[in-house]
Amino acid sequence: IVVSPLIALMKNQVDVINGYSEDDSVAHYLNSSLNRAAINRVESDVKSGKTKLLYVAPESLNKEDNLPFFQSFKISFIAVDEAHCISEWGHDFRPEYRNIKPTLEKIAVARNVRHIPVIALTATATDKVRIDIKTNLGMPDPKEFKSSFNRPNLYYEVRQKVSDEDTDSQSIKFIKSHEGRGGISYCRSRKEVEELAKKLTLNGFRAAPYHAGLDNEVRAKTQDDFLKENIDIIVATIAFGMGIDKPDVRFVIHYDIPKSLEGYYQETGSAGRDGGAGICLAFYSPKDLKKLSKFMDTKSEMEKEIGRQLLDETKAYAETSVCRRKVLLNYFGEAYTKDNCGNCDNCKRPKKYIEATDALECVLSAIKALKGQYEQNYVVDFVRGRATDHIVRDGNDKLPEFGNGKEINNDIASIWNPVIRQGMIAGYIRKDIKHCGLLKITSSGKEWLKEPRPFSVVPDREFVDSDDGGEGGTSALDLPLYQQLKGLRHDVAKKHNIPPCVIFQ
C-alpha cells in the first residue's frame, strides 16, 4: 500500500504501472474521487489477489468504515509517500498523517502480526522533520537512506519585488528569453493566478491557471495540456504542488517567496528533472513575509512559533549574499564545501567579504554566556547591548558579556545576522532543532574561542533589479531549427498520444 496525499496524481501513477502489465487491475487507487461502484471493484480486485499495489489517500486509510477492508487481506508493507506531511515542522502538515500509526496497529492486531513493515519517503526533510517522522510512525531505530539535496543543474536567483507591475514586467521579459520552454509560475492567491495567466496569454504565451478553486476536470485538462505541450506555462498556487511528473520543466518562477524553505525546495525541484538546466527565479519583498506573519495570528502559540522560525529561515535565504546552494543545503543538514557554486546569482555576482573576527568572538562569547538558552534575535539584541524587556526580565543585562559588540564599527552594525548564519555554515554555531531554534555553541566553536582564527563574512544582500533574463537563455540556439524540431516532436507525440518529452529531450 502506498499512502499519498497527491490525489490528483494517483490516477496517472496507476495508469503508468498498469501500462507495464496485461492486466489493468495490477494497480489501483482508493480516494474520495471514486464512486461506490469503482470502490467495490477496487476492493474485489484487492481481495482476490489481482492487485499488487494500492495507492490510498490518508483519509481513506484512516476512515473507520474502511478498516474491515484493510484488515481482510495480507499487506506486505506500507510506503508512506510525502512523509514530511506528518510533521508540524514540515511545510505541508496534514493532521490525517498522524493517524496512520494507530490505523496500522489496528490492522496488525486483526491480522495477528506484530507489525506491518513501513517505509517513509520524502524529498524535503530537515533533521527535525526526520525525527518527527520516526516518532509518529513508530520507527524507533529504522535504517535511513539519505541522498544529497544538491541539484547542481538548477540555477537559483532572488530578485527584489518593487511592485506588482515591475514583477510582471520582469517575468514577461524572462519568459520571452525562454520562449517555447516549459515552466511553472507560483503565486500565493487564486486571484493572482488568474490575473497573471491572463496577462501572459495577452502577451502571446500559451499559459493556463491552476488552483484548488477550479473543477477537477479543468485541472486535469490543464495538467494534460502541459504534459502534451499544448501549453508552455502553468500559473499555479501551491495546490499544484508536485502534482505532475514532467521531466523537462526549464524554469520555476515564484511571484511570492514561499513561507518555508522546504516548500521552496520542493516546488523548485520540478525544474530540470531530466538533468538539463533549470532556472529557479524568486521575487522577494520583506512586506510579503509580514503578510504571511499576520496570517498566523489566529493560530496556536506552537503553530505561530514554528511558522515564525520557518519564515526567518526563508528571510535569511532571500537576503543572504552567500552562495544560495550552500545556504539551502546547510538548512537541510548537508555540508557544501565549495565557496562558489557558479550557478546562483550570488556566485555569479559575488560581493566582497569583510573582516568579522571580532564580531564572531562577540557572538560565540554571548551564546556561551547565555548557556544556549536563547534564539537568534535575542542573541543579536544581547550583543548589541539592547536592554529589551525580555533581556532585563531574565537579568541577562547584568552579565559581563552584555553589549560586548557595541564597539563594533557602525558601518557594519547590521553584521550580526550574517555572522550568526555564516557561523552556522562554518560549524561554530548550531540551532537546537528540538527546542524552537535556540542557538548553541559547537565543540568547534569552543575551540575557536580558545584560539581565534581570521573570520570574514559577506554582508546581507541589497536588492537590485537584474537587467537580464537569468541564466540559460536561448541565445546560443539555432532558433528556427529548434522550433522545427519542437514542432516535429509535438506532431509525433500527438500521433502516438504520449507526452512529447518521451520522444526526445
Regions found by a protein language model. Name each.
Residues 303-335:
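Short, charged low-complexity linear segments at domain edges
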Residues 153, 248, 291-295, 310-314, ...:
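A general alpha-helix detector
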Residues 1-6:
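Walker A/P-loop
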Residues 307, 337-505:
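Accessory DNA-binding and partner-docking regions appended to nucleic-acid-acting proteins
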Residues 8-302, 306-309, 333-338, 345-346:
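Helicase motor core with emphasis on the C-terminal RecA-like subdomain
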Residues 175, 226, 318, 367-371:
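Short helix-to-turn junction characteristic of helix-turn-helix DNA-binding domains
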Residues 114, 321, 372:
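Flexible coil/turn residues that form the inter-helical turn or adjacent wing/linker of helix-turn-helix
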